A protein has these predicted regions:
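Membrane-interface alpha helices of multi-pass inner-membrane proteins
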Residues: 111, 174, 206, 218-233, ...
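Membrane-interface transmembrane helices that cradle and orient dolichyl/undecaprenyl
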Residues: 161-164, 203-219, 324-333
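Short acidic/glycine- and proline-prone juxtamembrane loop motifs at membrane-interface regions
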Residues: 182, 188-196
Length: 576
């Protein structure tokens, strides 16, 4: 695109992209219309493109001369950013407390299986390994997500490299991935999400490499990554579906005429077979879980979903990922990787239509950051200070990211200070992932508070029971967070293991609990009265910074079951 002069008094900037495939070191289009990469590396192809005067592509080093040596090379910058992220995560690993889901995964790690109601088996297996290798302290649990998320940062830079980007492109892509709040937040606790982001980003890297180098055998490796991803979180199926449709919709469909993508797809589903067998054996509980999903998720209109994308990926990254999307979809030099842009568009639409949580789309952003980094590096605007503007933008990414992270995702501020700031900015700024009342602090922090206080309150009630009732008492909770907390902290207080009807705790059943004496936490009184003749409120759980639905909870002591607890167990079933 060229902006023409607007009269003698004013000369508008010139914006141009190279228009010939040969400028990027590509051969002529194949018979299907898809350009096939030449033998040159992505870096050499980008250099050829940048050599054209007025092409709009600029070299990161003028005249082809290296500046600064290895210490400021693209690889070195990726290493520096990776070390920064790893250091930040490890230094904050012990802050606040155990996240709700971590307590659940710890419980699952003691009951390893090929599947669970609300998640596939990988995260429980990883948790079991971490506890075996490092223990179950907060720093120990947070080592793996820190390493995994650091890998995602590096992969974002490598995607930019594969797209032909140099030092600026790779560093910008990695930096944006580092500071994006949703990506950074899930790096601070052990969960499926950090792994999910890694598998998506690795899949995107392989996809770009396959398209770039015409190496169809890499679809096997792509299938392996998707298979591991399916063992972690089934939403990666959306990514796989989007890749397939994007290939069909572009000249890259020629890959589907080879055996390799089909073998890769078959390989990924082989990984899923044990999980599918577990579903069959247990009556497909995950289907019921997803059927109840809308109860838990905040309902968003398309504009609200888009606004949450902008806010939770950080507003300062908006120009970068929009530039990346534009480059992939509309710029001629990006046509080889057009399927990547289509993947993002389809995922956006799918999650809006399916009412997915806003952070489901987060794993798709590193590939846009990479393309945006290439656009920032290669897109020439005829402004005298454009180079300074580009450097200033990257500096803003770093500074704003460093300032905002402690306020939104990193557990570093004193909780009193965090609560004061949260109140000043009106809670979570309207960003809610779940249909739950907002706390004094954001949900990703609030769900780390109150667990041990709850256990201590239950222990106080337990100690008031006569010895004969203590010997037979069970602890029934309303959700897996409370049950996981009882199981984890309870032994220090001499408490028995918890039972619950929530998600996989329901499948684990009431165990040997007779129901003659039960301490019930956060279970509706009406439900208890349908099962027990004697329902007595004994205490109330209170916590200052926890989620409101975990505060002021009644603790009941119930006795005299109307039927054996095993028979009444379905009344407590809660797949949500």
């Amino acid at each position: 695109m060229v902006w023409e002069s607007c009269g003698p008094a004013m000369k508008r900037p010139t914006l141009q992209w190279g228009s010939k495939p040969s400028e990027r070191g590509l051969s002529s289009p194949s018979s299907t219309g898809l350009p096939v990469a030449g033998k040159e590396s992505p870096e050499s192809r980008a250099a050829v493109a940048g050599a054209e005067t007025g092409s709009g592509w600029t070299r990161s080093n003028k005249g082809g001369k290296k500046t600064g040596g290895a210490l400021v090379s693209a690889t070195a910058i990726l290493i520096y950013l990776a070390l920064v992220k790893l250091a930040v995560l490890l230094l904050t690993a012990e802050s606040y407390g155990y996240y709700r889901d971590e307590l659940y995964f710890i419980a699952a790690s003691e009951r390893l299986a090929w599947g669970y109601v609300d998640f596939p088996p990988l995260v429980a297996a990883v948790t079991a390994f971490v506890r075996w290798a490092f223990g179950d302290s907060l720093p120990s649990l947070h080592i793996i997500p820190a390493l995994v998320s650091t890998g995602t940062v590096v992969l974002a830079g490598l995607i930019a490299r594969e797209l032909g980007g140099g030092r600026l492109a790779q560093g910008t892509a990695a930096l944006a991935t580092l500071i994006a709040p949703t990506i950074l937040a899930v790096s601070t606790w052990l969960s499926m999400d950090a792994f999910d982001q890694l598998f998506w980003t690795l899949g995107a890297y392989l996809m770009v490499r396959i398209l770039n180098r015409d190496q169809p055998r890499l679809w096997l490796l792509f299938g392996l990554v998707m298979g591991l991803g399916l063992l972690n979180k089934v939403t990666i199926l959306y990514f796989g579906l989007a890749v397939f449709v994007a290939l069909l919709a572009t000249p890259a469909r020629r890959h589907l005429r080879t055996v390799w993508p089909w073998l890769g797809g078959a390989l990924s589903f082989i990984f899923l077979l044990p999980y599918a067998y577990w579903q069959i054996q247990n009556g497909w509980p995950t289907i019921e879980f997803f059927g109840n999903y809308s109860w838990k998720v905040e309902q968003d209109s398309p504009p609200e979903f888009l606004l949450k994308q902008i806010l939770t990926m950080h507003p300062v990254t908006l120009p970068l990922w929009l530039a990346g999307l534009y480059y992939l979809l509309f710029v001629r030099e990006g046509r080889l990787w057009r399927p990547v842009g289509l993947v993002f568009l389809m995922l956006f639409v799918l999650f809006v239509v399916q009412n997915g949580k806003f952070y489901y789309l987060a794993p798709a952003y590193p590939m846009l950051f990479a393309a945006g980094g290439v656009a920032l590096e290669r897109y020439r605007i005829g402004w005298p200070r454009w180079d300074r503007i580009r450097v200033a933008y990257v500096s803003v990414l770093a500074v704003v990211g460093a300032v905002s992270a402690p306020l939104t995702v990193l557990p570093v501020l004193p909780v009193e200070t965090l609560a004061s700031i949260t109140g000043t900015v009106n809670g979570n700024a309207g960003i809610e992932a779940e249909a739950r009342e907002a706390a004094q602090i954001p949900l990703n922090f609030a769900d780390r508070f109150g667990w041990e206080e709850m256990v201590a309150s239950v222990a106080g009630v337990y100690e008031e029971l006569p010895p004969e009732e203590q010997a037979e008492a069970c602890i029934l909770t309303g959700n897996y967070g409370e049950a996981g907390a009882i199981d984890f902290f309870g032994p220090e207080y001499g408490l028995p293991k918890a039972i619950s009807g929530h998600n996989n705790y329901y499948l684990w059943g009431p165990g040997g609990c007779t129901g003659e004496t039960v301490i019930a936490v956060n279970v509706p009184r009406g439900t208890l009265r349908t099962v027990f003749d004697d329902v007595e409120e004994a205490d109330t759980v209170s916590c200052e910074y926890c989620m409101p639905d975990e505060n002021n909870l009644p603790i009941y002591v119930v006795r005299s079951p109307k039927v054996p607890l095993e028979e009444a167990w379905p009344k407590f079933k809660f797949y949500k």
